[in-house]
């Protein structure tokens, strides 16, 4: 059984600021079936859970997570199909790495999301692939690939691939109801990710939280950022490819704050005022140019069959 043993190498962003450790303080456990996954990931004991056989369910199957876990895909087998990971009230300090998330096209309701984090803090999602499926604008689907919101906090999504899906990612309390209880949640970093063939929400629909989004490559899209209720977004050196000719990089509802620097092409249709915070007040990081980010993510984003390469 071979798997990435880089541990906390490449940890960056708000997950770094929160000192995420996952389960690396505990033993390594080989996971080969759904029952083993459920039995181990739901506890709070530190463990490194290595997916050593692809795990598939014929219908949507929710798996509740505990705390202090590293769930990591082996270099040989690393696919979770129709397995939906859900946070619980005890969830915190979790690393998801080198995993392939697949789901059937008929699992498409609004809340059908394979990674759903609405509790806890200290999450690192790294080198994962959310591979989607064929879609059309009229297929009736409402599902998304990933959600981090409500009171979930201090998270980083890095070096991941998101592709072939009508809706992409959604962050923050999922309503435009100006609910002050959710202001500031989540604090989230998105960096060195590749988004391809998605209609909207790549890199995401963002509400309420603080979002640092840098060095991502978004290609074949209709709308990129959707800035909604009370979101505070810092965008740096992101590369928008096919689809940018329609100026859909930013869908700004005018109800948050937004600052972009050095993205390609420049974002010019901002309605909201500029953001009043800086990422460097929370953690240090190194920027690539937008062109360098495009090249890096095409080569290195997503789950891998050999050693992981990190953008930070």
Curated annotation (Swiss-Prot):
Induction of synthesis: By DNA-damaging agents such as mitomycin C.
An annotated Gene Ontology molecular function: pectin lyase activity
Entry keyword set: Lyase
Protein name per its UniProtKB record: Pectin lyase
Catalytic EC class: lyase
Bias type Polar residues, positions: 256-274
Disulfide partners: none
Record-linked Pfam families: Pectate_lyase_4 (PF00544)
Family note: Belongs to the polysaccharide lyase 1 family.
EC number, as in UniProt: 4.2.2.10
SUPFAM superfamilies linked: Pectin lyase-like (SSF51126)
InterPro entries assigned: Pec_lyase (IPR002022), Pectin_lyas_fold (IPR012334), Pectin_lyase_fold/virulence (IPR011050), PEL (IPR045032)
Matches recorded under SMART domains: Amb_all
Catalytic activity: Eliminative cleavage of (1->4)-alpha-D-galacturonan methyl ester to give oligosaccharides with 4-deoxy-6-O-methyl-alpha-D-galact-4-enuronosyl groups at their non-reducing ends
List of catalytic residues: 201
Record Gene3D superfamilies: Single-stranded right-handed beta-helix, Pectin lyase-like
Region (Disordered), start-end ranges: 254-274
């Amino acid at each position: 059984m071979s798997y990435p043993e880089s541990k906390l190498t490449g940890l960056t962003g708000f997950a770094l600021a929160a000192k995420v450790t996952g389960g690396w303080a505990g033993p390594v456990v080989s996971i080969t079936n759904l029952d083993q996954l459920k039995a181990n990931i739901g506890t709070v004991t530190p463990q490194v859970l290595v997916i050593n056989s692809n795990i598939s369910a014929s219908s949507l199957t929710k798996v509740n997570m505990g705390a202090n876990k590293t769930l990591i895909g082996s270099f040989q087998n690393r696919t979770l199909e129709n397995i939906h990971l859900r946070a619980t009230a005890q969830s915190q300090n979790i690393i998801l790495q080198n995993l392939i998330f697949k789901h059937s096209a008929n699992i498409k309701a609004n809340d059908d999301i394979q990674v759903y984090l609405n509790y806890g803090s200290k999450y690192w999602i790294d080198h994962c692939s959310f591979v989607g499926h064929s879609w059309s604008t009229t297929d009736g689907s409402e599902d998304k690939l990933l959600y981090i919101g409500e009171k979930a906090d201090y998270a980083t999504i890095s070096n991941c691939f998101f592709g072939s899906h009508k809706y992409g990612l959604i962050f923050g309390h999922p309503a435009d109801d100006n609910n002050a209880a959710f202001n500031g949640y989540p604090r989230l970093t998105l960096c060195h990710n590749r988004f391809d063939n998605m209609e909207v929400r790549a890199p995401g629909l963002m509400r309420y939280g603080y979002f640092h989004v840098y060095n991502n490559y978004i290609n074949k899209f209709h709308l990129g950022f959707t800035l909604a209720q009370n979101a505070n977004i810092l965008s740096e050196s992101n590369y928008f490819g096919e689809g940018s000719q329609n100026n859909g990089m930013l869908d700004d509802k005018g109800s948050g704050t937004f600052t972009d620097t050095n993205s390609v092409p420049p974002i010019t249709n901002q309605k909201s005022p500029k953001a009043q915070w800086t990422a460097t007040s929370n953690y240090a990081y190194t920027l690539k140019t937008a062109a360098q980010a495009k090249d890096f993510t095409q080569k290195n984003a997503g789950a891998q069959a050999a050693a992981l390469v990190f953008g930070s």
